[in-house]
Amino acid sequence: MDSLILERLLAPTHLGAQISRQMKLDGALLLSARPEDIDASGYLSDLVGVTLIWSEPIGAPTRAVMKISHAGFGQPELPFYESIASHLNCNVIPEFYAGGVDETTGRTWLLMEDLSSTHERPSDEPLPPTFSRNASIVEALAKFHAAGWNRNDWHDVGPTLWDRLRSSDWLEEACHCLFAQAGDALDDRDRDAYARFLRGFPVLIERADRMQGRTLIHGDAHVWNWMLPRNGIAHSPKLIDWDGWHLGVGVWDLAYMMATQWDRDVRQRFEIPLLERYHAALIDAGVTAYSREALQNDYRLAVLLHMRTPIARFARNMSAFVWWPQLTRIQHAVEDLQCLDLLD
């Protein structure tokens, strides 16, 4: 962590002014903001604990975590917290205290609630969490999706799933490059499946445009982006790292979580029961006119469209440790759920 950027961002006058934009301080002044090491590592960001001392006990945070994104990353997360999260009234989203852009480096920074004493990771990546922990995650995800379900005020709120799908002119060439690199590690069945997918992709985009339940989605809601309450602590699960948020459909997050991240055996055992729990949680949260059958149909379409995901990882020059397992997992899910039948 660059000590100079911390010195700038944690200057009491500067940080206190930023916090005052998000909450009433009733004249209290921030006297000091002291950085501390925390047992957490950021992906494409630096994380540091912060102890805050105020002139008066007004209920302002005394412990927080500062996230400073690496240059060129994390920009969408700030407008999400500043303009979107406050309108959702959803406790799945961590509390946001302040944020901005460091003028010297252009790096985006956020000051958020410290979850270290109340929450923990659901498991050590890549070990899948237990079923009960996964159930807590999908129920909390449903709560978040329900908070933004079919709201009329999301028009022009930001990027959309359909915009991203339509901006896929790179897809076919990237497939050919990946297949050439993989060689005979990819069998003919996989290649044929992708050939069918590419031919039908324009039609799939139009079908996706008719999917039910438009809402805000996280975009990277794998289980290790969740923090679950520690045993004996009554808190909601928390979903972190919001730089991939956009308008879409809830099943997109679900399919990404299960079909691209879990090996076949785990997904086959957990998938249907977790979809049941997700649907029940949607209904409990007030969502209407969305049947379990409709959820299943939308989920299958989302899984099929996620054949694009490992190709996108490859096209962005991400490690084969990321895209190769995802390629295998999504092919298994497409086969198990007979998703290619949607192209007939």
What kind of feature is each model-predicted range?
Residues 1-107, 229-237:
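Conserved NTP-binding catalytic cores of kinases and kinase-like/nucleotidyltransferase enzymes
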Residues 119-218, 227-232, 326-329, 333-343:
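ATP-dependent phospho-/nucleotidyl transfer catalytic cores
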Residues 122-127, 240, 258-264:
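Glycine- and acidic
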Residues 39-57, 201-250:
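Active-site acidic catalytic loop and adjacent metal/ATP-binding pocket
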